[in-house]
């Protein structure tokens, strides 16, 4: 914890006041990523709802950003899981699922997304993404799955 406090530029006591141990600190880091993903999904829907963007474009953009977050959080999630850290997924997952569901519904209605696409499909794709991939791997992965997401009008 001392090394982490030095790197963060805070006193060790300050770090311990907020996070009693490394497991709690890692859980907080992973929670931040999960919350950020949910916020991003909601922001994407809000842009579509306000008429500032297209649902298919926002969904693909969200996936790209989500993959970047998956890459950045990969090590923290692995260590947190190994230490048995308690990560709160329920509330942010509900927010993300609702926002992504609205994006998909709008995209299907416009014909830009395939008519049978579901939020579960997106989650399956994200789970099987190789989280330690380079930017080139992420770009190629998105390029390969894009045709499977888009409808005939996409």
Task: Indicate residue ranges for each PLM-predicted region.
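Hydrophobic alpha-helical connector segments
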Residues: 28, 39-71
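Generic hydrophobic, amphipathic alpha-helix propensity
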Residues: 4, 29-33, 37, 100
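Short secondary-structure transition hinges
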Residues: 24, 61-102, 127-131
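C-terminal peripheral helix-coil segments that are non-catalytic and often amphipathic
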Residues: 98, 102-112, 125-154
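Amphipathic alpha-helical interaction segments
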Residues: 3, 24, 57-65, 121-124, ...
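Helix-turn-helix
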Residues: 1-24, 28
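Short, hydrophobic secondary-structure boundary micro-motifs
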Residues: 75-82, 112-117, 153-154
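All-alpha amphipathic helical-bundle segments outside canonical DNA-binding/catalytic cores
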Residues: 57, 91-93, 109-124, 135-136
């Amino acid at each position: 914890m001392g090394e982490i406090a030095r790197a963060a530029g805070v006193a060790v006591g300050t770090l311990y006041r907020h996070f009693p141990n490394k497991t709690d600190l890692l859980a907080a880091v992973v929670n931040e990523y999960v919350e950020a993903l949910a916020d991003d999904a909601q922001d994407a829907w809000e842009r579509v709802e306000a008429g500032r963007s297209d649902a298919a474009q926002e969904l693909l953009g969200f996936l790209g950003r989500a993959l970047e977050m998956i890459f950045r959080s990969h090590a923290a999630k692995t260590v947190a899981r190994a230490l048995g850290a308690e990560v709160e997924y329920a509330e942010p997952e509900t927010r993300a699922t609702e926002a992504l569901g609205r994006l998909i519904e709008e995209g299907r209605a416009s014909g830009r997304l395939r008519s049978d696409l579901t939020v579960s499909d997106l989650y399956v794709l994200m789970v099987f993404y190789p989280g330690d991939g380079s930017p080139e791997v992420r770009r190629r992965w998105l390029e390969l799955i894009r045709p499977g997401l888009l409808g005939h009008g996409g």
